[in-house]
């Protein structure tokens, strides 16, 4: 603890601002035609970390430090020409009135890629790259940026999206129209992972549908996180290097002509420094190491035709202690994965646009734990073709077809029953291949009638493994004025789950749900509320029968959240009441996430001249679980005896976290130093239970305790 305290003190002193730095603030108002431009991006061309977003009145404040000029002020807004103003010390204005000029050609070109989704209006949340980077709790991770939202109902400290009571495996992350399964790194046996695979610098837009996922995308019964990569860059080249307690990384982007650009990045992660500093907070962790590289290429092939290629490769391994059933030991995992997404978009006019999306995903994993020695090779391909036709300016229809092929090859030593994981238990060698090919088609229509938007669609899924299924949905968005918005949706959804360790087969999932969302925005304040209900039919592993069975689940939730900004402070709080039950043993019983009351809060202080500080807190009751009350021997093998379903509960979860960062200017170079302190209270938050070898005593495996993390980012 003394070492950690010294490091905190050292970094905190480093973050203290220098009194020799002088600063000035540019204030202004941005107009799009005659209306105030809401959410326009304002930034410096050569120092993109100095940025602001206009409020609903089009106003912004941009703090500058001495020595940063000369530079160029940039204002970007979709559908309008970029505003460019050279800045020098001599001509630095105190205030600006900026009037953006319409750019019909630019709007048409942007629409090809960015507006390919007809159902955008029905998303509950939209996050931009800047919002992901500025979120104190996100750690610049696009998926973790949702963690503080009211609709995020996690049962673990994971980057996997768990939306409105649905388990993470039933929500989909879609990137440029392509579903990305297992979108996390450091993935464990239960499918959970610590960080997402995506770099925030390549994210252009991120839409979140926490329930009633749009039928333009399939195979989701929970929700959808729809990520669109960057489609426009400011002029010039941008380079960023970073170093932290556990990683080093680099990012570089440059334009190739007016409509083409390249973004590339690479990272190396290692626990060599991270684990010794946090030895008391990470007792289960042995080591980890990973290397990843990504490329995003966007180019204009001809007038109205754009191509985008996003390619990603990761090589990772980790070792950590884990407890499962009656064994606790070291688990070792390695993973090599490469996925590629190619998008071709073509627009003949504002009335017609076409999109072709293709993807490949190849992975090879090794996993060792107890009696398990697993080698899995995964291959998946995806192709979709979509056509969007605008019958009028307010009425559109989208039609699409997609095909997905999945193949898993398993080879290794596996226990004869899923709970016989102790190394001394009976296990045998197995080799198998599972595959599935499915095709889906959809029709989606949208009609805008002034302040009211109505959308609806159907989606048909066909596969040789299962009978044909039909999904449908309808949505309505009503905005009586600029302050109030109501979104109502209902639908019925079908999906096919991929194999897991507990089930090497494909299984069907079904959900019928309805949701009502309301938001109020005025000035610096936002108030949101939601009510939703789901009835799901999901595959369930019967502990006694040792096979997958379909069971019913119902989820009801109420959400209330508020956000308010004043001067340099921002406060956010949300409350969720979640009821979740499962129909098992011929009666409704509580599900593991039948939390009832949950709450989150965050307060932040942003001051580019001094320091940025954020403090957040998350609380929810502990998970329910089915206890093991004894054992009986089958031959020489110990079989657990399970108690009443979800009759016991883990202690409640409470985590308080601190984040600090400081912006500094060194000549023409921008430097951001940051520090985070997780679980400040050093609580023993419970992760799961396991047992001794005789199943006599239950043991609780804790989550991470207090952790220190710090680093620096340098922008050229």
Question: Residues of each region from the PLM?
Answer:
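Short, acidic Ser/Thr/Gly-rich low-complexity loop/linker segments typical of extracellular
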Residues: 48-61
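Flexible loop and strand-edge segments within Gram-negative outer membrane beta-barrel domains
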Residues: 271-274, 284-290, 305-382
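Membrane-embedded beta-barrel scaffold of Gram-negative outer-membrane proteins
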Residues: 357-361, 479, 508-556, 563-571, ...
């Amino acid at each position: 603890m003394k070492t950690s305290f010294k490091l905190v003190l050292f970094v905190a002193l480093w973050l203290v601002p220098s009194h020799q730095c002088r600063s000035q603030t540019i204030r202004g108002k941005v107009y799009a035609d005659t209306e105030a431009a809401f959410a326009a991006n304002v930034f410096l061309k050569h120092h993109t970390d100095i940025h602001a977003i206009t409020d609903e009145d089009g106003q912004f404040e941009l703090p500058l430090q001495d020595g940063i000029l000369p530079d160029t002020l940039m204002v970007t807004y979709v559908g309008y020409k970029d505003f460019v103003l050279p800045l020098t010390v001599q001509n630095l204005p105190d205030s600006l009135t900026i009037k953006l000029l319409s750019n019909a050609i630019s709007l048409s070109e942007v629409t090809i890629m960015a507006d390919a989704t007809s159902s955008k209006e029905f998303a509950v949340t939209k996050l931009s790259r800047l919002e992901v980077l500025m979120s104190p709790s996100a750690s610049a991770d696009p998926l973790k940026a949702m963690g503080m939202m009211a609709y995020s109902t996690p049962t673990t400290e994971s980057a996997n999206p768990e939306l409105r009571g649905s388990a993470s495996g039933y929500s989909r992350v879609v990137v440029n129209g392509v579903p990305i399964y297992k979108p996390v790194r450091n993935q464990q046996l239960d499918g959970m992972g610590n960080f997402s695979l995506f770099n925030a610098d390549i994210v252009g837009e991120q839409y979140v549908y926490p329930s009633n996922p749009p039928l333009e995308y399939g195979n989701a019964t929970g929700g959808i996180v729809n990520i669109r990569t960057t489609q426009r860059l400011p002029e010039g080249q941008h380079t960023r290097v970073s170093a932290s307690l556990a990683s080093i990384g680099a990012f570089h982007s440059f334009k190739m002509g007016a409509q083409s650009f390249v973004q590339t990045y690479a990272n190396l992660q290692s626990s060599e420094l991270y684990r010794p500093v946090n030895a008391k907070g990470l007792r289960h962790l042995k080591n980890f190491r990973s290397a990843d590289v990504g490329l995003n290429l966007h180019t204009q092939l001809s007038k109205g035709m754009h191509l985008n290629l996003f390619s990603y490769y990761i090589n990772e391994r980790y070792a950590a202690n884990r407890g499962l059933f009656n064994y606790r030991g070291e688990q070792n995992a390695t993973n090599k994965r490469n996925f590629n997404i190619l998008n071709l978009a073509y627009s003949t006019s504002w009335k017609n646009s076409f999109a072709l999306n293709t993807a490949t995903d190849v992975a090879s994993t090794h996993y060792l734990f107890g009696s398990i020695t697993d080698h899995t090779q995964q291959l998946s391909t995806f192709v979709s073709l979509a056509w969007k036709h605008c019958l009028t300016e307010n009425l559109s229809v989208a039609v699409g077809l997609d095909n997905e092929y999945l193949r898993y090859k398993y080879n290794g030593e596996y226990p004869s029953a899923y709970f016989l994981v102790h190394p001394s238990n009976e296990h045998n060698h197995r080799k198998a291949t599972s595959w599935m090919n499915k095709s889906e088609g959809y029709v989606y229509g949208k009609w805008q009638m002034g302040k009211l938007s109505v959308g609806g669609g159907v989606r048909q899924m066909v596969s040789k493994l299962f009978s044909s299924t039909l999904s449908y949905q309808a949505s309505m968005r009503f905005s009586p004025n600029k302050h109030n918005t109501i979104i109502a949706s209902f639908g019925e959804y079908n999906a096919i789950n991929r194999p897991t360790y507990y089930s090497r087969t494909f299984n069907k999932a079904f959900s019928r749900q309805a949701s009502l969302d309301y938001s109020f925005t005025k000035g610096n304040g936002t108030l949101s509320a939601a009510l939703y209900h789901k009835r799901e039919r999901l595959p369930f592993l019967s502990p006694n029968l040792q096979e997958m069975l379909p069971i019913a689940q119902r989820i009801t939730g109420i959400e209330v959240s508020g956000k308010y900004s004043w001067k340099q402070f921002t406060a956010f709080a949300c409350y969720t009441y979640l009821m979740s039950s499962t129909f098992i043993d011929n009666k409704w019983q509580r599900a593991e996430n039948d939390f009832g009351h949950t709450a989150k809060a965050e307060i932040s202080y942003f001051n580019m001249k001094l320091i940025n500080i954020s403090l957040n807190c998350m609380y929810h009751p502990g998970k329910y679980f089915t206890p093991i009350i004894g054992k009986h021997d089958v031959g020489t093998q110990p079989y657990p005896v399970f108690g009443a379903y979800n009759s016991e509960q883990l202690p409640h979860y409470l985590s308080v976290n601190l984040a600090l960062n400081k912006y500094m200017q060194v000549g023409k170079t921008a430097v951001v130093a940051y520090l985070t302190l997780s679980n400040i209270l050093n609580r023993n938050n419970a992760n799961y239970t396991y047992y001794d070898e005789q199943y006599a005593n239950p043991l609780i495996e804790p989550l991470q305790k207090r952790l220190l993390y710090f680093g620096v980012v340098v922008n050229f």
